[in-house]
Swiss-Prot record:
SUPFAM superfamilies in UniProt: P-loop containing nucleoside triphosphate hydrolases, TrmE connector domain
Gene from which this protein is expressed: mnmE
Naturally occurring in which organism (per UniProt): Polaromonas naphthalenivorans (strain CJ2)
Domain (TrmE-type G): residue spans on this chain: 231-400
The protein's name: tRNA modification GTPase MnmE
Record: residues binding GTP: 241-246, 260-266, 285-288
Known cofactor(s): K(+)
Primary role: Exhibits a very high intrinsic GTPase hydrolysis rate. Involved in the addition of a carboxymethylaminomethyl (cmnm) group at the wobble position (U34) of certain tRNAs, forming tRNA-cmnm(5)s(2)U34.
Amino acid sequence: MLARHHHPIVAIATAPGRGGVGIVRLSGQRIAPVVQALCGRKLSPRQATYLPFRDAHGQIIDKGLAIFFPAPHSYTGEDVLELQAHGGPVVLQLLLARCLEAGAALDPATGQPVLAQLRVAEPGEFTERAFLNDKIDLAQAEAIADLIDASTETAARSAARSMSGEFSQAVNTLLEQLIHLRMLVEATLDFPEEDIDFLQQADAQGQLLRLQATLASVLARATQGAILREGIKVVIAGQPNVGKSSLLNALAGAELAIVTPVAGTTRDKVSQLIQIEGVPLHVVDTAGLREALDEVEKIGIQRAWTEIESADAVLFLHDLARHDATENPLYAINYIADDARLQSALALKLPKNTAIIDVWNKSDMAGPELLRQVNGGVLISAKTGAGLQALREQLLRVVGWQAAPEGVFMARERHVSALRSVQIQLLTAQNQLQAAVPALDLLAEDLRQAQLHLSSITGAFNADDLLGEIFSKFCIGK
């Protein structure tokens, strides 16, 4: 631990602004003297006590509840004091200042500060203390932040499961199996003179295959959890006036974007967070793609391409009404040719893993013959809502969402990356094990690297810069 981890800390634990209740939290080793100074009495452990909070001159700041959690039975593993007052910003700032003042006051008996080095906590420092004191592991700490930031009910429930340790338990089960396999390899290396084939006797190949199968299951659930956490960026693209804004409004269930018959109405992006089956989607409506008629439209089209290139999925809208060649064949031919050019441009600009869904809009205006000619994609009417459910289902399929919500771990990209690295190391280990003459030293190294990657998920193996990055993302007071 660093020296700062031994300093007592205090912070306002509730969100900024006005509220019915606000909390000031203090954590440190042996904080009983400052508890006495702040509360004017000794508090019974883990019992809420209603009392006045007074300043250094005895004047009442507020009245509320004080709860003392002696170590190690607290959130941080240290002594913790929580002061629950009315949630006004001024009241909470006064209580925070009073805590710092009480800690800095000199003890008449010793002439030393009552609570030396008491300071305001850094973002995430209470949760960091919980991790350092083995109250939670790193995956659980991250799940706490993910629960706070969850944008859908499904994401919140998945984060709660990870916070309770389901993800960590799955990782630890993998670690136990991996360590046992490593022991067999190391025993074979350490005792080559023994007339015992430890690997064959213990069915090392079978153990490795079972480990790989378990890993694949955990990785699949974690990948779905990463989708829940990060969300999916969906960009609506196409020529002007094909119904992009109408589609955004239909998906969002609200009139977010202006809809007019005039081509080029949308000049800048319009974004909205929606959810499909609990999966958060960041849907972006963009300017129509064509040769710009003025400088403002040109900027809007450039921004549209920027959004498209960073999308996880692109909904490319076709206007079925303009495909009808019965009234104006030349207009329809030109429109279809422009659509084809835009589709080619999309294919060239976008990464291969970006999903492109052809969406045929205005199906309510197309005749049966034209509808029969549509090959691939999804038929919809943004105006009537026809086909929207099929579009939602297609969106989830193309981005890889397939797990039942109750089976999903809330996971981060670093977790998924670590699990994939383990998968690669185990595949290399499998090749070594199946060789005619296995290179046991290389096999042992593959398994060691796999263990390091797994351990990084829960923090059993970590780097200080990784910890700093993770906990800095928390709010102050958590």
